[in-house]
Amino acid sequence: MNRRLALGILGLGLLALTAGCTSFLGPGEPDPGDLTANETYDWDAGVDADLDVNKRNVTAVFDVRNRTDGLDDSDPTFRFYGRGTLATEQPQRLTAVQFRYANGTQVAFESVDGEARSVVTYTNGTTAQLPVLSVERTNDRTVVHLPTNESGQLGVTLPKDGKQVSFPGYVEGSYQMRLPESARVGVPLLSQVRPGTSDRTVANDRLLLSWEGVDAPTLVVRYYLQRDLLLFGGLAVGATLIGLGGALYYYRQLRATQKKREEVGLDMDIEDDDRNRPPPGMG
């Protein structure tokens, strides 16, 4: 076999191994530091899914009653996933995983001997270390094992890439999403909201999008900052001016060419040519 061909095949194999390391080397365990990270969630938003979009991540609170997967009574779970570079499903990175019971009791992870252990904080302020909440990674999911299947809320922080937020339909029902300061939607070329909604309000320079009865497989919001709109408008005006300038230059060149033709007689009207007239007395 040609040496270059062999090296090429080896390189492709290493690339495939690197890209799919989750499949070849196993999913790995969640980082204890991720699970024990501190985050404050809005437990009283009053919707089935509350999504707070920040510059670098999304803090989310989901009502576990209306989730679309993991409904096994013996092992209730909430399963998170994202899309890889080849559009394959892969486990989603979660940080600051917390749970809140309907009565206000909360569960969060704390670091104990280098491991993340779930600690229950009761409404009277007392705490207890109990294994009621756990997280594992499979080849294509990050699975949160819930304390209960019937009620409660799950709070997680998820990564965000650029100015787009895309979520599978983890729960059905009402959604609301707060975008970062100065973020807006509305210009088709710069933004997208799917499924669409006309329920949009602005408070403290943050746009709030709301949906009722969501059962779509995916929720996608792409937004722009107001300064992006000014930049885009400036570019559009610049492109228009360049186009007008080009048209004016072309028009002037055309007029100059016509003038030169007239000067050398190339545009003389053939009806005025004496050679085409009949001899005298025969006209």
Set out the residue ranges of the language-model regions.
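Context-gated lysine
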Residues: 55, 160-163, 259-260
